[in-house]
């Protein structure tokens, strides 16, 4: 958890990794987008997952605009789309589409987690120049 002060690159990457873990744990029983609306408990899962997607997007945005960006090496990840999703969640929450959230969780987070893990183990991220 954030305890104040300036976040380092590693702090931001760790927040992304933690968020991916939480989302994957919370959404284990979600098998389709409609499951998010099946009960109040599932709506809470949806809201929690979306909040963590927002955290991921916020941290990606902070890392994306660093010069040089530690993310620039991994062009296979749609970094700007991740940041754009954060903006949608933050500014147009009622327009968040359950299907897009479901697809993101089930199809995209695994690859993102692999890249974030690689970034955490690179000396550039660890050095935090």
Positions of PLM-derived features:
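Extreme N-terminal tail/first-helix region
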Residues: 1-14
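N-terminal first-folded block
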Residues: 11-46
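Charged, amphipathic alpha-helical oligomerization/scaffolding segments
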Residues: 15-18, 22, 55, 81, ...
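Short, contiguous, well-structured surface segments enriched in hydrophobic/aromatic residues
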Residues: 52-63
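Short, mixed-charge amphipathic alpha-helical segments
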Residues: 65-81
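Histidine-centered, metal-coordinating catalytic motifs and their short helical/loop contexts
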Residues: 79-96
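C-terminal structural segments of small proteins and small subunits
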Residues: 94-102, 107
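Conserved small/polar residues in nucleotide/adenosyl-binding loops
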Residues: 121-129
């Amino acid at each position: 958890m954030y305890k104040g002060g300036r976040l380092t690159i590693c702090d931001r990457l760790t927040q992304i990794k933690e968020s991916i873990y939480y989302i994957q744990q919370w959404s284990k029983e979600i098998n389709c987008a409609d499951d998010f609306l099946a009960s109040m408990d599932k709506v809470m899962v949806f809201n929690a997952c979306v909040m963590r997607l927002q955290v991921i997007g916020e941290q990606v945005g902070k890392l994306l605009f660093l010069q040089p960006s530690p993310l620039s090496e991994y062009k296979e990840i749609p970094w700007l789309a991740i940041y754009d999703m954060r903006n949608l969640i933050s500014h147009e929450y009622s327009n968040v589409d359950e299907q897009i959230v479901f697809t993101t969780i089930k199809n995209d987070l695994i690859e993102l987690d692999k890249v974030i893990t690689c970034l955490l183990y690179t000396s550039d991220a660890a050095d935090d120049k």
